[in-house]
Swiss-Prot record:
GO terms for molecular function: metal ion binding; UDP-3-O-acyl-N-acetylglucosamine deacetylase activity. Keywords: Hydrolase, Lipid A biosynthesis, Lipid biosynthesis, Lipid metabolism, Metal-binding, Zinc. The lineage of its organism: Bacteria, Pseudomonadati, Pseudomonadota, Gammaproteobacteria, Enterobacterales. Its EC number is 3.5.1.108. This is UDP-3-O-acyl-N-acetylglucosamine deacetylase. It comes from the Bacteria. GO terms for biological process: lipid A biosynthetic process. Zn(2+) binds at residues 79, 238, 242. It comes from Shigella boydii serotype 18 (strain CDC 3083-94 / BS512). Its cofactor is Zn(2+). Catalyzes the hydrolysis of UDP-3-O-myristoyl-N-acetylglucosamine to form UDP-3-O-myristoylglucosamine and acetate, the committed step in lipid A biosynthesis. PANTHER family: UDP-3-O-ACYL-N-ACETYLGLUCOSAMINE DEACETYLASE 1, MITOCHONDRIAL-RELATED (PTHR33694:SF1).
Amino acid sequence: MIKQRTLKRIVQATGVGLHTGKKVTLTLRPAPANTGVIYRRTDLNPPVDFPADAKSVRDTMLCTCLVNEHDVRISTVEHLNAALAGLGIDNIVIEVNAPEIPIMDGSAAPFVYLLLDAGIDELNCAKKFVRIKETVRVEDGDKWAEFKPYNGFSLDFTIDFNHPAIDSSNQRYAMNFSADAFMRQISRARTFGFMRDIEYLQSRGLCLGGSFDCAIVVDDYRVLNEDGLRFEDEFVRHKMLDAIGDLFMCGHNIIGAFIAYKSGHALNNKLLQAVLAKQEAWEYVTFQDDAELPLAFKAPSAVLA
C-alpha cells in the first residue's frame, strides 16, 4: 500500500518573524500515523495546538493565518505548508516559540531543505488522498479559482499585474505536480511586495521582518533586489506556491486539476472549503500499490532516500 509519511528525526532552525521582526525558533517533530499536520505555539502556557484545517483559516490579509475558537492565532504558515505538500508529509508537529512561522527567504526552499535533512519515514498506515469528483468553482469579482476531476495534480495559475517589472508573457504558469517538479520549479519562488507598502506597514508597527532578504521588493518601475529574480516568472510561480500551501490545509494531497485567475489566499481557501462542503464533489482514496498511484505522487529518490 501507499503509506503515510512523517519525519525520521527532530530538526530545528531559526529565522525572523515577518510581522514581529523577532527571532523565531522552529522545531519540526515526527508524529504517529493519522496525527495530521499540527502547528504548535510553545510561547504560550500551556502550548496551543492548531491542526491544519481549512475552516481554521480566518485572516488572509498578508498571509495565511490559523485562528482557534479562543481567537489565538498562528501566522505565515503557507510556505511551510507548501513544502509539506511538495514532499507529501502527512504527519508532523511544527513548534514555534512565537505567534508566527519564520519567513526565512520568503520561499519554501529552506523548509524543503529542513524536511529533507530530517529524512522522510514511511508509516505502516495507508495514505489518504482527496480526489475531486466534480468541478467546483468560486469567484470574487473578476477573480476565480476552480477544481476539476483529473487523475493527478495539475496547476494552471494566471496573474494580471500591470507593472513594468512583470512582462505580460510571464503572468501564467502551468505544471503537472510532482515532488521533483515542486522542488525544482516552485519551491524557490519568493514572496513579493511594494517598497511603499512595506514602509507604510513598518511605520504602523507591522511587517517588521520585511526586507530584501525575505522578499522580492519592487517600486513603481523595477525590482530593487540586487540579485534580481530567481526566475523570469518568479511572481506567478510564487502565487502557485501559495496556492499549493493553501490547498494542503485539508491535510491531504489532492488528486485533481486546479485552475486559477488572480486568486490569492482568501479565494484559495474559499475554493477548498467549497469543495469539502459539497460531499458529492470529492472522496477519500487510498492506493494498494505504486502502479495505481497517479504519477504526481510517486516519491523521488531524494525524498525517500
